[in-house]
C-alpha cells in the first residue's frame, strides 16, 4: 500500500515538473519570438493613410534587416522619444543621399526627381530649410499622409539612424478584411 502511495506521489511530482517545464519552454519561446523575430505593432493616428489606418494591427518583422539593409519605400517601425511609442513611416532617402523637398512638393534625391506614388495630400518641406545630406547610417522617412505626418521633415524626428530601426511592417493582422502581407514596392 505504501509503495502505491509513493508511486502516486512520485507520478504527481513528475507531472507537475513536466507541466512547469512545458510552461517555461512556451514562455521562453514566446519571449524569443517577440524579442528577435516579430512584434505586434498598432498604428496610432492617420500619418500612413491610405496604406495603413488608425487602429490597424501589424506584425513587425525583426529578422530581415539582419540579412539585408532597409530599402527605399520599405515601411519601417522605430521608437520615438520622449514618449514610449513607435512610429511607422516609409523610407524615402537612403544613407549618403541628399534629400530635398521643393515648395511645390516635388521630392528630389541627389538632384533627381523621386518617382513615387505613396504620397497622399500635399508634400511640403515643413521645417526643412534646404537639402538634407544623410549620414552613412541614416534614413529619411515620410508618412504616406504627408499633410499630417510628423516625420523626417521635422527636427523632433529628423533623420533616422539605422540602429533604432526595429524592423519592417510586414503583415496586417487587423482589421480582418484587410489581413495580409504589406507590399511596399
Regions found by a protein language model. Give the residues of each.
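Mid-length scaffold segments of soluble, non-membrane domains
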Residues: 86-112
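Extracellular/periplasmic catalytic domains that process cell-envelope and extracellular macromolecules
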Residues: 51, 69, 92, 100-101, ...
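Short, surface-exposed secondary-structure boundary micro-motifs
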Residues: 63, 81, 104, 112, ...
Amino acid at each position: 500500500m505504501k509503495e502505491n502511495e509513493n508511486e502516486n506521489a512520485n507520478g504527481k511530482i513528475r507531472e507537475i515538473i513536466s507541466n512547469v517545464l512545458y510552461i517555461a519552454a512556451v514562455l521562453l519561446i514566446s519571449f524569443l519570438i517577440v524579442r528577435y523575430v516579430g512584434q505586434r505593432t498598432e498604428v496610432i493616428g492617420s500619418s500612413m493613410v491610405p496604406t495603413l489606418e488608425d487602429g490597424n494591427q501589424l506584425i513587425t518583422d525583426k529578422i530581415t534587416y539582419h540579412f539585408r539593409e532597409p530599402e527605399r519605400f520599405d515601411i519601417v517601425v522605430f521608437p520615438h522619444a520622449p514618449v514610449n511609442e513607435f512610429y511607422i513611416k516609409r523610407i524615402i532617402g537612403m544613407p549618403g543621399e541628399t534629400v530635398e523637398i521643393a515648395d511645390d512638393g516635388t521630392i528630389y534625391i541627389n538632384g533627381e526627381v523621386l518617382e513615387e506614388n505613396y504620397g497622399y495630400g500635399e508634400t511640403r518641406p515643413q521645417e526643412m530649410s534646404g537639402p538634407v545630406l544623410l549620414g552613412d547610417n541614416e534614413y529619411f522617412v515620410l508618412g504616406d499622409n504627408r499633410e499630417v505626418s510628423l516625420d523626417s521633415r521635422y527636427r523632433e524626428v529628423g533623420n533616422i539612424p539605422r540602429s533604432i530601426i526595429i524592423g519592417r511592417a510586414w503583415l496586417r493582422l487587423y482589421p480582418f478584411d484587410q489581413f495580409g502581407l504589406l507590399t511596399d514596392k
